[in-house]
């Protein structure tokens, strides 16, 4: 029996976020291209070296990127939109596609399946010449071989998933374009095989949610590829869920091995294997360590899994690997010594997960006695955290038990509430607002750092925050916005801020993961029962409201987003954790309302991303996600207006869920997705307050008034002007002041023009 250790992908960002810093230095012209490429190579090779030293046998090559692996694939295959044709160098084209430029909008960005990672959406255009423009995986494979002597495992995004994630073609064109991908993939794989690649990992995460017809279509493509590259050792890799529905067909694909997720798809994949077995002539790559969470594995459970598999499958060849790329986990926990011992011991970041793979390999090849000490340690760690007082609070349990049906609904229906709110708030037609945050300048970040390091006092820091808040209240008044925000200068991150003020959360010092491009986030760790402690946003919001006669919105992050953007305890259902968060937020919302705040926004940008990949599992998730939002927001008076915000989602899947949230106003990203939600509203109705984002805040370019007016015009074709709001796509935290002010001025002018037109046509 042959058993190997493997990894599917390693975090890109560097132990001290060297990758992020290098990218941003290059973008701001602080380093030149040569220095950029040299530093990136050093980081890339260091990651390979770490995995080599940890004892991983099949080390992924090509998972490293300058921005996004889907964008890498798009560039490699020639999926380059014509609007970027004026750029000549690779990096200029690449980063223009990712970030846009002064004159060109970026390609769309959206969530990578149900994770908090974002990918750049490939664009197909008529007349596109699909070819292998650049065999990047080959270059990186040869680099690792020459520089480190590592015969790595090239990782590529599979043709079917790639094209399914792309946009710009009709369904009728899909099959034709898919066939056009065969030639470049054949060339790519042929060259890798000729260079000596022993195993080539082909990622097809979309296989977890395909129809039988689609699987057959994908199989034909793999048969066409295999015909031309008969000797390449292809490992077909799936993850994020099981392939149960199509397992019987997938195991007949002409590949040498198949990777399955036995963490997030354990039940389905095991059921399929028990029914259909597994081919003797293929390698089974077992995703047995959670690549999306930060907890130590249950080694006993993993070894039991292998015992079950060895009884049920015909193959003798296994690969021990994570459930997915470790892109979604921080790199190393060794710096987190500030954490309690019980929590620190329970954690496993990427490097620790690699060590777990080696432990499992040892147990499988040498017997469990070879890791008997480690097994005992793991059992003790799991017992300690499970029985901890922070996970067994009686007050939290009592609050959950006491919930009644009326806790999940507003007293009056939307139409009647909105009438009362219009009287109370006295807002104009097509009111303007922003999504919440304003620029976190170098001064803001530096002052916060000084405060956290004890260089300045609490009083000095609070004075600084008040000064920034007042400055931006005045800016908003001058610009002419209708509903203002305090700017969130006191907040580092929209989830971390609340987690720091709620019981049950803990925070890492260096637990960074990539969200999109160079943007990294440090998710909170929900390790215990969540409960309210003290007011979290009252002071700053009430201060901002005291500065102006205009309405100021309270700003909170919703329970489902806090859940989905955190590393969550895995000993109770996610629904229960979400309800705990909702109850804590409910208390905060009641305090805001009693302090005179009449508009309260509860953001849920991550509602869609938490949905299971399989449609059959959607209803159960949506039910408790919506109930969580309602639990947080339903205790306010009818006159209090509840807003919510969403971005980067496939909204057509959740229109009914959005409606069920019963928010008085929802603001939704529209501009970067090129108006897709506007198209969705052409086929359905939305009868509540809605703001469709009129400009993309993730690009540095300042859009013209006319661009925004066009989106307003398109939106009003499908939205009732009585309920329509005008706002940017998202918060403005990452933008510069000189970008924000003119953009908002253009937005307000577009709103005024639209109001004038509506009055003229009335």
UniProtKB/Swiss-Prot annotation:
Binds 1 zinc ion per subunit. L-homocysteine binds at residues 435-437, 488, 603. Pfam families: Meth_synt_1, Meth_synt_2. One of its GO terms (molecular function) is 5-methyltetrahydropteroyltriglutamate-homocysteine S-methyltransferase activity. Pathway: Amino-acid biosynthesis; L-methionine biosynthesis via de novo pathway; L-methionine from L-homocysteine (MetE route): step 1/1. Its EC number is 2.1.1.14. L-methionine binds at residues 435-437, 488, 603. 5-methyltetrahydropteroyltri-L-glutamate binds at residues 17-20, 111, 519-520, 565, 609. Its cofactor is Zn(2+). It comes from the Bacteria. Keywords: Amino-acid biosynthesis, Metal-binding, Methionine biosynthesis, Methyltransferase, Repeat, Transferase, Zinc. The active site is at 698 (proton donor). It catalyses: 5-methyltetrahydropteroyltri-L-glutamate + L-homocysteine = tetrahydropteroyltri-L-glutamate + L-methionine. Catalyzes the transfer of a methyl group from 5-methyltetrahydrofolate to homocysteine resulting in methionine formation. Belongs to the vitamin-B12 independent methionine synthase family. This is 5-methyltetrahydropteroyltriglutamate--homocysteine methyltransferase. It comes from Bacillus cereus (strain G9842).
